[in-house]
Amino acid sequence: MNTFSQVWVFSDTPSRLPELMNGAQALANQINAFVLNDADGAQAIQLGANHVWKLNGKPDDRMIEDYAGVMADTIRQHGADGLVLLPNTRRGKLLAAKLGYRLKAAVSNDASTVSVQDGKATVKHMVYGGLAIGEERIATPYAVLTISSGTFDAAQPDASRTGETHTVEWQAPAVAITRTATQARQSNSVDLDKARLVVSVGRGIGSKENIALAEQLCKAIGAELACSRPVAENEKWMEHERYVGISNLMLKPELYLAVGISGQIQHMVGANASQTIFAINKDKNAPIFQYADYGIVGDAVKILPALTAALAR
């Protein structure tokens, strides 16, 4: 048996749902989707869900993760085994841990490939900071996985599909986290996972002000702007949501133009699936050139304006 009888899907990020649903179609005979509202439920059915389970009644001061108890109860009531797919987000990982405990299931994070053999999930993911690939065969009846971005292609919606909708009512957990305040966060409005062309900057760009040169190039060629982890996490020059690497975005664009990025393995595992990699770096020995299809050795601050002018013609 190379599929599970049932798979359960939940995504706290709507843009990740099509990818998870495509994976669900390949891994199980029946697809169940937990959703937070009617619009997400309709989307899940169009993407292939046979049953939609609307999570309902959570007080405003409680966390989405506190639905874990009723989610686990619902999963157990409808089968003695099964697969749970979640996005590899912070909330996805926290929810995976809670579900794993309640289902007595093995949990595997950052899955980059998933297959089923003899009714058991086999998962591969990066280990040792991206230096190797680890493989796990999950022996527990339930398997809870968080899926790295780009693991599956996005499922295409079909408005003719039909499915059944159910309601799962909130039950307060014995121990809960109460939200006392919220603060709006300026988040990335661009879905980099879907970008055809990506210009990504590293600390070699020199300063936050010089990022404007990369933005001008993006505008000239219709690309989206990304960055390395140090630019986002250390220098705070760009948003966390835009950094590429093993612990965040895993991209597969047609073109990845790396500007001032050294090319450490932790970054390249997030970009190495690109169809074409073009690197600009003043260090001719930078590791990025081992991955690049094309490269220019030189100062990015001087090269970017010339490249933008040439491509804008």
UniProtKB/Swiss-Prot annotation:
- Fetch the Pfam families from UniProt: ETF, ETF_alpha
User: Pathway, according to UniProt?
Assistant: Amine and polyamine metabolism; carnitine metabolism
Q: Which residues bind FAD?
A: 255-283
Disulfide-bonded cysteine pairs: these are none
Q: What InterPro entries does the record tag this protein with?
A: DHS-like_NAD/FAD-binding_dom, ETF_a/b_N, ETF_a/FixB, ETF_asu_C, ETF_asu_C_CS, FixB, Rossmann-like_a/b/a_fold
One biological-process term from Gene Ontology?
carnitine metabolic process
What keywords are assigned to this protein?
Answer: Electron transport, FAD, Flavoprotein, Transport
Q: Which SMART domains match?
A: ETF
Is Flavoprotein set as a keyword in this record? yes
Query: Which SUPFAM superfamilies does this entry report, sorted A to Z?
Result: Adenine nucleotide alpha hydrolases-like (SSF52402), DHS-like NAD/FAD-binding domain (SSF52467)
Lineage, top-rank taxon, reads Bacteria
**PROSITE patterns assigned:** ETF_ALPHA
* PANTHER family from the UniProt entry: ELECTRON TRANSFER FLAVOPROTEIN ALPHA (PTHR43153), PROTEIN FIXB-RELATED (PTHR43153:SF5)
Please describe the quaternary structure of this protein: Heterodimer of FixA and FixB.
Q: What does the function comment of this entry state? A: Required for anaerobic carnitine reduction. May bring reductant to CaiA.
Recorded family membership: Belongs to the ETF alpha-subunit/FixB family.
Q: What is this protein called?
A: Protein FixB
Which organism was this protein described from?
Shigella flexneri
